[in-house]
């Protein structure tokens, strides 16, 4: 296999046994593809596909005026260029967006002409607001903060059949219902009531009999009955009644008389129940007429109206129950034939017939009026209004849309073969749904499972943005329609008709404040990726936490390979917010698909198909771990498979598909947990969630025991610098990498230079530090896709969230009681868990009523010492160490005139005005914060003079840009001259540049000429002259291009900033705060094993082994058995082996062993103990040595989920590292030197420091603010609040009889306003007495009682 630049330097020993059939797909594809589809940015007018913006425009346009004399048509749109790039947007606090310009055509028709001749056509581009762009990492920058739009899992449009599970009626009878859900428009529900009549509801309003809807659709009673029922035909001749017999219909009935065949042989005796055997005999005998007694038709329902043959008068309407009186009438009228409905109690109930009987309407108009009354109660119905309303409900494309998905689901559910069709409903659709519902009630067919992933689809960013955009356009449409009527008379242009504000507002609201537009979780690369791959059932059009029951939240069999069964939050959102599985993707309809290998006749192929939950149901799917031979044949007699959403076993020849990988079941976060298969699910859930909270440490440290997914996450998350094209590193420093692109990847006419500016010490959304460090050196060769620089929490292109710690599982002095963690001081000294946090502090100078605020170093009543870190502009220097209360930006605010005392007047007269009319409102460092200023940004409003600091910052930025562009030009120039040198070498000169004709060019000749002189050469060959001219022109063009680029950037920097109204200047100061680990910080492993640091012990006191190596962390062994996360023990053992092998390699290097010996030992590690084979043959000796050097701190291992290291392999690794195979060692107490009784499990575990730091939580109140009503101190750190002394605490003091303490707690320390001020005065006077008064809460109580209308007063004697 081919190794990438970083893989070659450090190979991870992989224990997986199964072959890689398919690489893990790009992890952010779900976001990027969806939004790319929405914008269709590169497409030309003819290439637009009917999705996204284009579809939204097409659905609203053309807009036709009310009179029909003018129309506005949509032609196409184009997107402009963004004003700022992503980094500038974040810095300036603006949205990263592009202007949208739409080309529309205004057509005015001639009123006079009969055939609507066109009078005038105007075409124009109209600005329609800004559309936010997605960054290449799948995020949006909205108002300077990075946000993620989470995908939504909602009910797919279509038709669903369900029942109430017997909960509605006390008898427990199942009431069936059908619901047609469109993509937009009114919901249509059909439901049975306990009496078995069918009702319809529109938009969940009052119910009507379903027949009302059928009547409104134009069906008569007879047509309805014909549609839903078959008929029995009876012939009457005199007193005799005979039935046209269909034998099947008799099944289950009791014979009312003997039934004979033609020969008179009795087939069924009277009183016997007719069975299937009897039916067969009747069919064989060919009995098709049956004489029946008159009573046989009593109680049956007529299928057609019964008409008097002579007079034509109607004796009985259709759908009338036959009674004895009616039969007498029929006999009198000498009717020869009656048709009745065929119903029975088993599989053909009289539901529709019964519904028609309770229906009060008799024709279409009455039905329409009834529906109108239900939809618009209180309004007087007219025929036109009722018809319009009904047509608009389900049959108008403007108001109703099933969407392609809805139509496909609808047609499939009611058994049609075609999957495309109209977006609106038809009569047939409604009737088919009713038929299917009645069939289900009759016991044919089954109800749908609403939690099946075939009935839930994913709405991604693009689709949600399109919906919002359409909402905005519909608002515009109303306004345009009104203005169109004026367009003709006033000669308006399209621009005057369209007001883009509603569109811009709808889009802005969606990206800024929708429930699914979330502040990106940017703790570490994994939390970013997980946030973008999240699927939420909440949000607009989705579920709410309170209403979601167990079923929706539960794991469903169809989640397999689509949604992770492990990763979901704990708490109220459990199961509502999920994560996509590693290989899952969405199909064109938005359903989740999972990949499978095709299996034919027991032979597994490498063809891969993606199937949705609906498509996979009929397949027989084997697991990825099913045993195969070399010919890829399944060899087990019975293979474990999934079929019809159940787990079972089948013969190999029945298998049709096979999983592509064992990790296709779980999400990215869960696939990073080694030995996941040995952990309990609840703990795995915690492990997945806690990895997302890990804070990037100062020096990232790759996990010794990983799963092989670390590289994918680091690469796809976008925090690393990945080579866009292959080439050679031209130069590299801490802040940028310059690559000279390989010739075969350079497109003609462009510079073969890629410059990568690295992000240095930038603040993330969670205030952690984003910093990139180069991995490459000058002259290194890189290929496309190689990782050239590490970001936060990445180490050599692998995700590295924590540190490998030497741990021991042992109880030790109670320091690890209840999951506490005991650490060694060495961890702190080596800065293993030191993290850098960056805080942004902002100072805003506004224009106030009394005058402008001013940012200055001249602050009243502040000593010189407090100002020594500020420059002359009043802004702190970069690099200054500041602590709580230090001034960062000096600011003064004008203050209103106050009445002055005579003394103040005198002082003013002597010392001048200045000091008194302004107050100090400087930006100071908040309490509990201490750090270093690493950056300052100054933004000034247009027209306000910029201070010296702003100019200095601007000059620095310009120098940076100029340096970049010069570098690019230098390389372009160098590469051009290199190409020329190779072309000219050995060629003959025709003259020019001071050379004689006939001179042969050599390297010396060229070195003797200045570069400018080369272009003056005239060569004997014309082709070379042409090449020289082209090269000269190319260099001139490049120079001009780069100069233009510089001017453009300069213009952007020098123009004033667009600040909020009333703001003159904003200064942002960035503080870097360094936090070491300390007691109270939360730490965790990857297996849900979390704890709080309880104590940090000196190194010499920690337990140590026989060699004197102390352990770093002591964990409580009781934390393992009850939690059932045994994965941590296996990780510890394997980690010990990994470290031991590293130390062995280190010794070999120190003893200066030969490369061949090292190669032999590495082969033993990588290729002799299970797992994937590594091809060490292709490595040179230098590369083997470089590899060995990188393995000194431990050989990293990968144990993929469900396909990891076996116990025997861990033991073999320990043996190879010359360590005990039990993984246990004898330890000695560092304090006494005594040996512990039993051997202790010691090894290396990967530990994370979570973003729950004690520094952020510790807080103490001194003097602070009080609540307005109760006058009690506020609560919480943000409000600088106090600790609540609640009722239980009061009981405790009462119980101890601590009366004075209790009194001051309830009065002066809380809400006795006078008492507390008096106490302060007393303390100042040196008088330590306390006089409690009336607590304010008593006054509040009295006011509340009075509000109930009870007069209450406190009498003070």
UniProtKB/Swiss-Prot annotation:
A Gene Ontology biological process term: DNA-templated transcription
Superkingdom of this protein's organism: Bacteria
SUPFAM superfamilies referenced in this protein's UniProt entry, alphabetically: beta and beta-prime subunits of DNA dependent RNA-polymerase (SSF64484)
Catalytic activity reported: RNA(n) + a ribonucleoside 5'-triphosphate = RNA(n+1) + diphosphate
E.C. no: 2.7.7.6
Entries under InterPro entries matching the protein: DNA-dir_RNA_pol_bsu_ext_1_sf, DNA-dir_RNA_pol_bsu_external_1, DNA-dir_RNA_pol_su2, DNA-dir_RNAP_su2_dom, DNA-dir_RNAP_su2_hyb_sf, RNA_pol_bsu_bac, RNA_pol_bsu_CS, RNA_pol_bsu_protrusion
PROSITE patterns tied to this protein: RNA_POL_BETA
GO molecular function: DNA binding; DNA-directed RNA polymerase activity; ribonucleoside binding
Keyword tags: DNA-directed RNA polymerase, Nucleotidyltransferase, Transcription, Transferase
Pfam families: RNA_pol_Rpb2_1, RNA_pol_Rpb2_2, RNA_pol_Rpb2_3, RNA_pol_Rpb2_45, RNA_pol_Rpb2_6, RNA_pol_Rpb2_7
GO terms for cellular component: DNA-directed RNA polymerase complex
Function: DNA-dependent RNA polymerase catalyzes the transcription of DNA into RNA using the four ribonucleoside triphosphates as substrates.
Family, as annotated: Belongs to the RNA polymerase beta chain family.
Subunit architecture: The RNAP catalytic core consists of 2 alpha, 1 beta, 1 beta' and 1 omega subunit. When a sigma factor is associated with the core the holoenzyme is formed, which can initiate transcription.
Annotated protein name in UniProt: DNA-directed RNA polymerase subunit beta
Protein's organism: Pseudomonas putida (strain W619)
